[in-house]
Curated annotation (Swiss-Prot):
Pfam families: KOW (PF00467), ribosomal_L24 (PF17136). Belongs to the universal ribosomal protein uL24 family. NCBIfam families: rplX_bact (TIGR01079). InterPro entries: KOW, Rib_uL2_dom2, Ribosomal_uL24, Ribosomal_uL24_CS, Ribosomal_uL24_KOW, Translation_prot_SH3-like_sf. One of two assembly initiator proteins, it binds directly to the 5'-end of the 23S rRNA, where it nucleates assembly of the 50S subunit. This is Large ribosomal subunit protein uL24. It comes from the Bacteria. CDD domains: KOW_RPL26 (cd06089). It comes from Vibrio vulnificus (strain YJ016). Keywords: Ribonucleoprotein, Ribosomal protein, RNA-binding, rRNA-binding. The lineage of its organism: Bacteria, Pseudomonadati, Pseudomonadota, Gammaproteobacteria, Vibrionales. One of its GO terms (biological process) is translation. Part of the 50S ribosomal subunit.
Amino acid sequence: MAAKIRRNDEVIVLAGKDKGKKGKVTKVLATGKVIVEGINLVKKHQKPVPALGIQGGIVEQEAAIDVSNVAIFNAATGKADRIGFRFEDGQKVRFFKSNGETVSN
């Protein structure tokens, strides 16, 4: 199945503690999860690794969020939107279901 949410897409969170927040997708995982910039921040207890120059301490980082809890953000309408696929000039492209505009990559 083709990916409806891809890296660098602007998404809006639909459910969870960060509901309503927008961010850019930094990574799409094969497990059906995405990592979004500035969303779902968790505190990780980092162990120091002197050989690599890594300091220890409590580090805040983004955790994965299920792809079903985010939707692509349509800048033209200012709302969350759904994605469809169609062929244009022999290429499979994504488009917004609400207004039919092609999603830029």
